[in-house]
Amino acid sequence: MEDKKEEGESEIQEHGPEHWFSKWERQCLAEAEQEDQPEEEAEQSQQKLWHLFQNSATAVAQLYKDRVCQQQGLSLWVPFQNAATAVTNLYKESVDAHQRSFDLGIQIGYQRRNKDVLAWVKKRRRTIRREDLISFLCGKVPPPRNSRAPPRLTVVSPNRATPTETGSSVETDLQPFREAIALHGLSGAMASISVRSSTPGSPTHVSGSSNTGRRRNGLHDVDLNTFISEEMALHLDNGGTRKRSSAQCGDVITDSPTHKRNRMI
């Protein structure tokens, strides 16, 4: 059992991530790991600033001492000049050191990022997904991987549609119309309009006088918004658009010039 376990571990090591890299890639990785961070330069800059600060402090103290213990015939110009020169050098070196430390910080940041990416690459497979790399660089969790199944095609007859699709399409098409009526307040302004509310399928093509009387008795003053809602509900319950019968079409054109001419005769 132990021999088999050792053989399995040796196979894993032989086929591990380190064996995926070529000779050139291994050389680049070794050079990246051996790069030393420029800490010596930072220490030298700090020592130089400390030395200039000591000189400035000594010059200012000497200027104060000479001013207190001033003797006749001695000028304070030389101590003042020395103090001003020391403070100026300290300021210039401080600005330069600040810029160098800023550049050094950027360089160290790049090196650390490269090392982190290389360490992450060593643990990954031979092929790295784009979203995994972007999520690692941005410090976020990669999105879940959904299995991309092929879309299913449903064949529907062009002359026949399902009631659900018909109702939803009609509802979607008439939604702007209903919103327009609600926004402009036509329900109250159009309440006095006469709307035909006869039952579907009733005979309407009759003589002139009886047709006129029946049309007057069948028309009622109803709210326009209520009428539209009832018609839409009736239309959706039937499962599709309804075609008007020839009798209804004849009722619509009763006021045509030909019909009026017959009445005149």
UniProtKB/Swiss-Prot annotation:
Subcellular locations according to the entry: Nucleus; Cytoplasm
Summary of subunit composition and partner proteins: Oligomer.
Region (Disordered): 1-22, 145-170, 195-218, 240-265
Family membership: Belongs to the TAPR1 family.
One Pfam entry name: TAPR1-like
Keyword Nucleus tagged: yes
Record-given protein name: HUWE1-associated protein modifying stress responses
UniProt biased composition (Polar residues): 156-170, 195-212
Superkingdom of origin organism: Eukaryota
Summary of the function given for this chain in its UniProt record: Acts as a central player within a network of stress response pathways promoting cellular adaptability. Functions as a negative regulator of TP53/P53 in the cellular response to telomere erosion and probably also DNA damage.
GO CC term, one of those recorded: cytoplasm
Keywords annotated in UniProt: Cytoplasm, Nucleus, Stress response
GO biological process, one term: regulation of cellular response to stress
